[in-house]
Amino acid sequence: VELGIPAQAAKGEDDMTSSLDDTSHAADADATPARASVVFLFDVDNTLLDNDRVIADLRRYLVRELGAERTDQYFELFERNRAELGYADYLGALQSYRVCYPRDPHVLAVSSFLVNYPFANRLFPGSLDALEHAGRFGPTVILSDGDVVFQPRKVERSGLFDAVEKRVLIYIHKEQELEDVERRFPAQHYVLIDDKIRILTAVKQCWGRRLTTVFPRQGHYASAPEVQRYPAADLAIERIGELLDYDLPALMQAAQP
């Protein structure tokens, strides 16, 4: 689904991951998955889906429903929760807002907006084509961070759940769960596509030449100052659709130690 989490929370995370993938033998703890030659691991937010635009839509909606001042308060609560939890939790921030304003009648409308948002409309051009292209070479897997309600909902409603044939893993800190990733989807080689250079670097430090890192320069992280503080990814592309320009040999050969 980042942080040390209590055993009960960890169990809940594992249950949630399995429920997303209950028809996949790779997600069944009792099965012994076959070792693939290559597995493709795709992030969601700002990799396959324009999450910056989702947040912009949310802010506009909140301003209309709650007003500018309370919208700012909502996002302050959101950032505070993210600092404490280690992941984005929009519904959790709404619950915190509700504690502050228990009689605000707009809370239910905002909740409905989040849960029913048309995420499929926010897929980047070429996202589904990139998944289909990679799927010709090996299994494609969603590897994401997030809460246990909103992030799975986003994956399902966007169509990504079906596009990867229900192979979905959502952790709190995915870069700390690589052993579980390998257990569920064993492979000789992995290709990780993620808009956060920090994540790419952390996974590369663990898997080394067994991993090809692909950095799509999409979303606000692409121009963040921290990008310059990390080693370059094995491959950088300007948009997710450019993944179609690379065949399997090119992706494998791009892997650096």
Model-predicted segments: where are they?
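Asp-based, Mg2+/Mn2+-dependent phosphohydrolase catalytic module
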Residues: L3-G4, Q8, T17-R35, E156-L192, ...
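Active-site neighborhood of HAD-like aspartate-dependent phosphohydrolases
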Residues: L20-D22, D28-E76
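Generic enzyme active-site microenvironment
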Residues: L41-D43, L143, L192-I193
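Conserved Rossmann-like nucleotide-cofactor binding loop
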Residues: T47, V148-V149, R198
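Conserved SAM-binding loop
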Residues: L48, T140, L192
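A metal-dependent, Asp-based hydrolase signature
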Residues: V54, E65-A68, F78-V115
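Short, acidic loop-to-helix structural element flanking the phosphoryl-transfer center
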Residues: V115-I142, I172-D180
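Substrate-recognition/cap helix-loop segment adjacent to the acidic, metal-dependent catalytic center
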Residues: E132-V141, D145-L169
